[in-house]
């Protein structure tokens, strides 16, 4: 919703000079207007798209560093309980045995209740 409103405002601002320009005056190419629009687009992408994703990624990395034996995790649709933690992998107990997966493949972490 917010992004639609922001896009509408940016579109209107981009069209404003052509709406209110005199018909008789010649249009001259300026660097200012495209530079301002590019700056607004960069700020938009930073605050709306990139920054929240960066925060989410940092929070997940922190949670992965705090993994403990007994935590329940999901990885690529597989749900298991951590049996062993290694440097870059974890060993999961699943219904039919154990599997080893990369820590990077873990998508959700459910802490073990103590």
UniProtKB/Swiss-Prot annotation:
It is a single-pass membrane protein. It is found in: Cell inner membrane. Coiled coil: none annotated. The keyword Cell cycle does not apply. One of its GO terms (cellular component) is plasma membrane. The keyword Electron transport does not apply. It comes from the Bacteria. The chain crosses the membrane at residues 30-50. Keywords: Cell inner membrane, Cell membrane, Membrane, Protein transport, Translocation, Transmembrane, Transmembrane helix, Transport. It holds the Pfam family YajC. InterPro entries: Preprotein_translocase_YajC. GO terms for biological process: protein transport. The SecYEG-SecDF-YajC-YidC holo-translocon (HTL) protein secretase/insertase is a supercomplex required for protein secretion, insertion of proteins into membranes, and assembly of membrane protein complexes. While the SecYEG complex is essential for assembly of a number of proteins and complexes, the SecDF-YajC-YidC subcomplex facilitates these functions. Part of the SecDF-YidC-YajC translocase complex. The SecDF-YidC-YajC translocase forms a supercomplex with SecYEG, called the holo-translocon (HTL). PANTHER family: SEC TRANSLOCON ACCESSORY COMPLEX SUBUNIT YAJC (PTHR33909:SF1). Belongs to the YajC family. This is Sec translocon accessory complex subunit YajC. It comes from Chlamydia muridarum (strain MoPn / Nigg). The lineage of its organism: Bacteria, Pseudomonadati, Chlamydiota, Chlamydiia, Chlamydiales.
């Amino acid at each position: 919703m917010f992004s639609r409103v922001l896009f509408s405002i940016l579109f209107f601002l981009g069209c404003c000079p052509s709406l209110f320009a005199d018909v008789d005056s010649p249009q001259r190419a300026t660097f200012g207007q495209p530079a301002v629009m590019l700056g607004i687009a960069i700020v938009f992408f930073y605050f709306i798209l990139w920054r929240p994703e960066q925060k989410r990624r940092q929070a997940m990395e922190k949670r992965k560093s705090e993994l403990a034996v007994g935590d329940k995790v999901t990885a690529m649709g597989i749900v298991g309980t951590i049996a062993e933690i290694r440097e870059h992998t974890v060993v999961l107990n699943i219904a039919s045995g154990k599997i080893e997966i990369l820590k990077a493949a873990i998508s959700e972490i459910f802490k073990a209740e103590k």
